Amino acid sequence: GINSDEIEEIISKRNAFEYLDILGIQFFSGTQKTSLKKLKREIDKLDNLLILLKEKYDYTAEELEYGTGFPAAYFKEDTINEDELIGGFAQLLNEMTSKPKITLELGRSIAAICGKYYTHIVDKKCNKGENYLLVDGGMNHIVYYGQHMAMKQPYLSVCGKETEPCTESWNICGSLCSMNDII
């Protein structure tokens, strides 16, 4: 990425490149954002930059591609009020002074619910009274930081054995050689 000073420099020199047409700005700033205050700060900053580019360089951005960083509910206890978040965000966009064509890149907020992660057990072991199941995937296949989110529970179902009662607790671990690869 580039910062606003670099954007200004590029826009100030755009006429030196007759075959280059700069349509707008692409902005991505993070993920798992649930705060309208944070989104407002970002939109205000973007709007102010677009206004400055118009006033200082007579450049009007036709397009703004915005990676919103909207959250995805990865865990059972995650609660996201999507109506409030998206409604508030739409209002913030409507309040912008500059009016580029806006394309939203929704990323994981929309893709996270579009599939399932399947894995299977490749090994099992017991170590000092703790049961471990090793699976053929790991934290490199899903966004789940075992150490950071250790108390959160991902959605889980066991295919083919739903009617058998669970009599033991097992730790499910990925195939990476890391103590943090706990699913």
Regions found by a protein language model. Give the residues of each.
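Glycine-rich beta-strand-to-loop/alpha-helix junction loops that act as flexible
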Residues: 28-31, 64-73, 106-109
